[in-house]
Regions:
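Switch/connector loops and helix/strand junctions flanking conserved nucleotide-binding motifs
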Residues: 20-21, 67-69, 87-88, 101-104, ...
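A generic beta-sheet turn/junction motif
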Residues: 72, 199-203, 212, 494, ...
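Outer-membrane beta-barrel proteins
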Residues: 6, 25, 32-35, 40-84, ...
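Extracellular/periplasmic, surface-exposed regions of secreted and cell-surface proteins
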Residues: 8, 226, 232-241, 246-251, ...
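Short aromatic-centered micro-motifs
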Residues: 11, 277, 492
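Residues embedded in well-ordered regular secondary structure
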Residues: 3-5, 9-10, 19-47, 85-220, ...
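A surface-exposed, glycine/aromatic-enriched loop/edge motif typical of exported proteins
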Residues: 106, 110-161, 250-300, 355-371, ...
């Protein structure tokens, strides 16, 4: 439904669209790796206990999604949760215990002796002669494979070793085989508990549920906890008025290492002769995982002086995330006459997300996350970092419509609906990154930019770039979205066989230019319940229990939030200095566009649904054509 925008479907929970936008801080690197809940729990159903779900349905065409208008361009997923019913009190408990075993090292992987022998064969066949020639002319190329190639070529600390010393070192490496799958992964036990209480009478029904889940990841120091509470009360004091109130609360926490090294990839490709620890228990640097690429000239790898050790990354980095989500919803139905009623819905939600990412000063993650260009193998400067985010999101939605339904002469059924909706979302993210962080004291000391040369001169351009890095490491991001919608639908049903429907809708959004804020869409559909025909009765109905032909066409509008109707300035590293102030300069990256309008999707669809043997077997056949109109995409203009 879009090229550059968001094509994700709209999630609707008990009539409330989940569209709580989360601003993204302008910070590079994947900061909160293990559990960034912001979008998961804001736009989907991540915070709902699966045991509370009554049903899930998908609205796929324009006619079916008409009530959600512009938000439905990517489709609609409707989730209905359980509610109380008239009757005795029901208490339900369910619990699960699951065991996940760690990945097992493949029997086809070589052990240390086999790997070293293979590396020696490759050295003898492809590199030994080139190495000997290189000693003479200094220009001959020879490939280095594994630790054997490093030792035989005298790379780094192996320079000057005699052949006997080289053989002794290789033999020592072959005396131990590391199963990296056993070192990095674990067998875990995860549990979940769910308790619900429901019941009521014709005047009032209630539903309460609580849930807890704990998932232990197979990666070391990885865990996830989830708490849920759900409460609903539905009251019907008389035949005229009914109303209900529901509240949902969920809280999630996640912990994991923050290292950006793929542990599954490392476990498979790391050499078996590498060890996680020295004999004295200290971390042992991996000599081959990163270094071989540099030795063979593909690219330069910057490593800290103490080298790379994945166990250090696991133990001395952390990514923690917490999310609390509270939603309060109220609904009412007023039966004005026998055929006319008013339905209202109001919802308010609040989300609070917090993330914290810590890189210990001795880790490779901290080494690669430095505010200035001193990450070479000769630098001895080490310091940690901490990155923290807090996001606060509020959202409200008000919707009301009048619905009229009447049957004429027992063969004509007319349903008419007209309503309006307003919604607003406000989200604010505050982020800060501190270098030189000490996790013991909680303090930090921002490192000074390194001087070059004996006169302690600092290059001005690099110093300005350093200042920009520090400026961008702390700040805030704010998003605000408001919408107003007006809609109407009409359905006509003849003989309970032929169904005609049509809908119109107009949506207004602050995401567009001042001249294009409102967008009108329409849809129309027809369905034929063939199984209601007289010639479908009798023996044929024992085989074909239901058959419906569907035709639908219409438009839906979409909001592409990757483009903006307002002027945007992108700041750079240049300054303008006056007598009293210093201003950062920038360039216009987005010109104002009062004509920026909605993206539209037009679809035509035909479908046939057939149920066999009392609908025990169902067949669905569909054909459709989807067209995108008014798509926003980058275009080069000739000046």
């Amino acid at each position: 439904s879009t090229i550059t925008g968001n094509a994700e479907p709209l999630w609707v929970i008990d009539g409330v669209p989940m569209q709580k936008e989360v601003p993204t801080p302008p910070v590079s690197n994947t900061q909160i790796r293990s559990g960034d809940f912001s979008n998961i729990f804001a736009t989907g159903i991540g915070g709902i206990n699966p045991n509370d779900i009554e049903s899930i349905s998908v609205l796929k065409d324009a006619a079916a999604a008409a009530i959600y208008g512009s938000q439905a361009a990517g489709g609609v997923i409707v989730v209905t949760t359980k509610r109380g019913k008239s009757g005795p009190t029901h208490v339900n408990y369910s619990g699960t215990v699951s065991i996940q075993t760690r990945p097992v090292r493949s029997a086809n992987l070589m052990n240390s002796r086999e790997k070293l022998a293979w590396e020696q064969e490759l050295w003898d066949e492809f590199a030994a002669a080139g190495y000997a020639n290189n000693l003479q002319d200094g220009k001959s190329y020879y490939p280095v494979v594994g630790i054997v190639g490093m030792i035989r070529s005298g790379y780094g600390k192996y320079k000057g070793l005699s052949v006997a010393e080289q053989d002794a070192r290789i033999a020592e490496l072959g005396s131990h085989t590391t199963d990296w799958f056993e070192e990095l992964f674990r067998t875990t036990v995860s549990t979940s508990h769910y308790l619900s209480i429901s019941g009521g009478n014709p005047k009032m029904a209630y539903y309460l549920s609580m849930g807890y889940g704990n998932d232990q990841g197979i990666v070391l120091k990885n865990s996830y906890d989830r708490y849920n509470f759900n409460g609903k009360i539905d009251v019907t004091p008389n035949r005229v008025v009914s109303f209900g109130i529901s509240t949902d609360f969920s809280y999630q926490t996640s912990k994991a290492p923050s290292s950006n090294v793929d542990m599954f990839k490392y476990a498979y490709f790391a050499n078996p002769y590498e060890r996680p620890y020295n004999d004295d228990g200290s971390y042992r640097a991996d000599e081959t995982y990163f270094s071989l690429s540099e030795i063979n000239g593909s690219y330069t790898v910057a490593l800290p002086e103490n080298g790379f050790n994945l166990m250090r990354e696991i133990n001395e980095t952390s990514a923690k995330s917490t999310s609390g989500n509270f939603t309060l919803t109220g609904n009412t139905t007023v039966n004005i006459t026998k055929d006319l009623k008013f339905v209202g819905l109001a919802s308010f939600s609040y989300i609070s997300d917090h993330g914290e990412n810590i890189n210990g000063k001795n880790t490779y993650a901290a080494w690669m996350d430095r505010p200035f260009e001193n990450n070479t193998t000769t630098s001895k400067r080490i310091y940690g970092s901490i990155y923290q985010t807090s996001t606060y999101n509020t959202n409200y939605m008000l919707r009301g419509h009048f619905a009229y339904g009447h049957t004429f002469n027992e063969i004509h059924r007319l349903n008419v609906l007209a309503g309006a909706q307003i919604s607003r979302n406000y989200a604010k993210t505050i982020f800060t990154k501190r270098y030189g962080y000490d996790p013991v004291t909680g303090n930090h000391s921002t490192p000074l930019y390194p001087a070059s040369g004996n006169n302690s001169v600092i290059d001005y351009d690099k110093l300005v770039s350093f200042g920009k890095t520090l400026d961008n490491s702390t700040g805030q991001a704010i998003t605000e979205n408001a919408m107003a919608s007006f809609y109407g639908t009409i359905d006509y049903i003849l003989l309970n066989r032929y169904v005609f429907n049509a809908s119109v809708r107009s949506d207004g959004s602050n995401n567009f230019g001042s001249k294009e804020q409102f967008n009108a869409t329409w849809s129309a559909g027809f369905s034929w319940n063939i199984d209601e025909e007289s010639w479908m009765k009798g023996k044929i109905s024992d085989v074909i229990s239901s058959m419906t032909l569907r035709l639908a066409t219409g438009y839906t509008g979409g909001v592409n939030k990757s483009v903006y109707p307002v002027i945007i300035m992108k700041y750079d590293n240049t300054f303008r200095i006056s007598d009293t102030d210093s201003y950062r300069m920038g360039t216009i990256s987005n010109a104002p566009n009062p004509h920026l309008s909605w993206e539209k999707t037009w679809d035509i669809k035909a479908g046939l649904d057939i149920g066999f043997f009392k609908d025990r077997l169902r067949l669905q056949v569909e054909a459709y054509n989807l067209s995108l109109i008014h798509i926003s995409e980058p275009t080069r203009l000739q000046l």
